Amino acid sequence: MRSLLARYHYLGYGGPVGENVQHLVHDARGRAVVVMVWGAAAWKCAPRDAFVGWSPAQRRARLSLVANQQRFLVLPWGRVPHLASHVLARATRRLARDWQERYGHPVVLAETFVEVERFAGTVYRAANWTCVGRTQGRSRQDRARTLQVPVKAVWLLPLHVRFRAALNAPLTASEEGGAPCC
């Protein structure tokens, strides 16, 4: 996966951040056609945080219940109509289970960031994701608020019917080291 992303993805490999799940999809001939890397959610994202409706304390306690799609790549030889949205929909249906098996806790919401100057987000729309707003053109390394990066559309997909209940549940005294489940 690393070499495929390094060679064919416009952002390169970069390596996953924190907890992560990687999906490599093969065609009927056994060739890799799609690469997906899911990782830890963005620490702060105003459109996502408003959509969820959580407080800063709830975000701190429950951010581990959100997965970020860090890379999504359809390889050049995998150009098949509707392949990207089909694979994306199937991958998100199994993401919570894969995360639970690997890390012992679920994820209830998926997020991704799409550069608006490069992509329209059609694949996400076709896979039932919701665009909830745009970033401000800053990055997590921008502590001084001077770094300019491309503005991105924020796309979200609930992975569980009760995702808001899981993310917004009242904090418990014992929750400092963990997160509730639905």
Over which residues does each language-model region extend?
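Acyl-donor binding region in acyl/amide transferases
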Residues: 1-163, 169
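Short, cationic low-complexity segments
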Residues: 173-182
